[in-house]
Amino acid sequence: MKVLLRLPALLASLTLLQMAASTRNATRTATIRETVDEVKVQVNKAFLDSRDRLKTDMSNLAPTVRHLSGYLKQAKGRTRTAIRVGQVWEQSLKRLRRMVPLTNVTGQGLDLTSLSWEVGCGHPAPTVTCNISNPYRTITGDCNNRKNPELGSANRALARWLPAEYEDGLSLPFGWTPGKTRNGFPLPQPRDVSNQVLDYLNEEEILDQNRSLLFMQWGQIVDHDLDFAPETEMGSDNYSKAQCDELCIQGDNCFPIMFPKGDPKLKTQGKCLPFFRAGFVCPTSPYQSLAREQINALTSFMDASMVYGSEPSLANRLRNLSSPLGLMAVNEEVSDHGRPLLPFVNVKPSPCEVINRTAGVPCFLAGDSRASEQILLATSHTLFLREHNRLARELSRLNPQWDGEKLYQEARRIMGALIQIITFRDYLPILLGDELQKWIPPYQGYKETVDPRISNVFTFAFRFGHLEVPSTVSRLDENYQPWGSEPELPLHKLFFNTWRVVKDGGIDPLVRGLLAKKAKLAHQDKMMTGELRNMLFQPNHTVHGFDLAAINIQRCRDHGQPGYNSWRAFCGLSQPKTLEELSAVLRNEVLAKKLMDLYGTPDNIDIWLGAIAEPLVRRGRVGPLLTCLLGQQFQRIRDGDRFWWENPGVFTEKQRDSLQKMSFSRLVCDNTGINKVPLNPFQPNSYPHSFVDCSAIEKLDLTPWASVKK
């Protein structure tokens, strides 16, 4: 009876508790919503202001290197949306964390699910619905993995093979707070490291006697197919990029690279090189880590996305949709001796026009926004554009019943195979040398459980190629002799330099230079040419250049990269602790001492620098750590790709046999006026030795595609 009497009171108490809990939850939700709404207004305004300022700056008579770099690194379309939402998430999280003790907003912890919902973290990349009968890749990379359709798609976070390491555990990079140490030692300034470790005189440059300039350029092509992390914007309308650029004020997403005492750039460029942090995305449920994760704006697959784009809107803009032949759009204003060039961008003015206002030639439009960054890259993009259209026309001749969409998709699929085959057959063996089989064994077929995403550390590992860039680029005539009045041009004059292609010889002289000239040798004592270390994006004497080495080091910290020894441990390599041990690993006591004097401990050496400092493996062009990191990544790219060219069902057996005949030399023969090419374009060749007529180079036979039904 007593229990029955107490029951109404118990129910009343439970009701009151439920009402109180409901009220608290409503208060928390309202507080989260109010906070997010305030942050959205602030961030959206900052993003709009930043874009408007960049347009204004680019219209000025004398834009700075920051403006040129900002144009190159700006996020667009869905990428910009994803980065903006990521910024709203992070700033809202920081505000709410400060409010917790005052308002008890989230009780035991922040309601991250509600926060994610209010921010709109799922909106930039909505849930994917896949057509399982579609025989072609999506432009975005979605639906490659049927169990996890988003795996490897564009505008997702780069994968972490080791947890991020930030100064505050969340987003601040090491080196942000003055006086704060890492592993007991202060971090050196990136520019100081660059000056002391990577500097050498251009005239002392050592060229690679066994690798052509194409070896360097192919690496950049592959990189631009796999990853791109655009810069984020300032998160506050009270703090602009101009303040970062002109006043070197660190704050928000500005992380300037300060010049050390005595640096010659102090006289010409003020106190610093402006540096803006990479764009990042929202964390995902179950929120095991809230550390900042940088975006990959591209698909992680080797799918020729630098030709076709990673967003549907861009992909459509790159096509000639009025043609029934599945063609890519070409430039309707200019051509290269009757051969097509890439279309111009519709942004006015573009950096390429700013560089040479007299010539007035805009930048080129391609699947990757960096296509006009340097002239050899623009040349490569031009070859790929021409090859797609050649393939589409030939496929149409063989299959007149195919419509434009099928012709486009089939040509696109063959282009993806071209990139894959040249990379794995011709490029990686001479990059990884004797370590190739250890890290990339023979293909055993598609594995659904393999994660193909590009890792955060790969974006630094693949920057080894910066050490292979020579100080000059050569243009050669039909006899592979110096072409024109300026046959050899310093690299810094070829940034954003499309006018040289349009008005000064076209791409053929540049392609010959790729085939016949040598890459720079990555050498411990002569690491990076001054054209990149002091004159990056410096097109003329009125614009002072960036330091690519210092940028790479600062970017390691921006991305929260673990140090050198953490990655050595990841790869099963020894972890040197003393000068003697580091000297043994590097086989170079002088270099080891420089690094120890700068960093105090090998644990702190930035991963990019530590990796490129190692001696090269036998018959390769990277050291043991890089062979591990690069080898693992490329194996994952291959084995985790359902559309890999060797995977049964992607191509027929006869088609695969035909595809193996593709080569860079054949690409040149079919798409330029060049008729003499080397048998092995990745090794330096001295004309006429090792050169043959194009008739001796095997052609891709497309007859296996005749009337093939997919």
Curated annotation (Swiss-Prot):
The active site is at 224 (proton acceptor). Induction: Repressed by the androgen dihydrotestosterone (DHT) and the estrogen estradiol (E2) (at protein level). It is found in: Secreted; Cytoplasm. The modification Phosphoserine is found at residue 313. PANTHER family: LACTOPEROXIDASE, OXIDASE/PEROXIDASE. One of its GO terms (molecular function) is peroxidase activity. The record marks 370 as: Transition state stabilizer. Heme b binds at residues 223, 373, 466. It catalyses: 2 a phenolic donor + H2O2 = 2 a phenolic radical donor + 2 H2O; thiocyanate + H2O2 + H(+) = hypothiocyanous acid + H2O; iodide + H2O2 = hypoiodite + H2O. Residues 23-98 form a propeptide. InterPro entries: Haem_peroxidase_animal, Haem_peroxidase_sf, Haem_peroxidase_sf_animal. Disulfide bonds join 130-143, 244-254, 248-272, 352-363, 571-628, 669-694. Thiocyanate (SCN(-)) and hypothiocyanite (OSCN(-)) are bound in the distal heme cavity. The iodide ion (I(-)) occupies a position which is stabilized by the interactions with heme moiety, His-224, Arg-370 and Glu-373. Hydrogen peroxide is held between the heme iron and His-224. Its cofactor is Ca(2+); heme b. Keywords: Antimicrobial, Calcium, Cytoplasm, Disulfide bond, Glycoprotein, Heme, Iron, Metal-binding, Nitration, Oxidoreductase, Peroxidase, Phosphoprotein, Secreted, Signal. The keyword Heme applies. It holds the Pfam family An_peroxidase. Ca(2+) binds at residues 225, 299, 301, 303, 305. GO terms for cellular component: basolateral plasma membrane; cytoplasm; extracellular space. Its EC number is 1.11.1.7. Belongs to the peroxidase family. XPO subfamily. The modification 3'-nitrotyrosine is found at residue 480. The keyword Ribosomal protein does not apply. Expressed in the lacrimal gland with higher levels and 3-fold higher activity in adult females than males and secreted into tears (at protein level). This is Lactoperoxidase. Binds 1 Ca(2+) ion per heterodimer. Binds 1 heme b (iron(II)-protoporphyrin IX) group covalently per heterodimer.
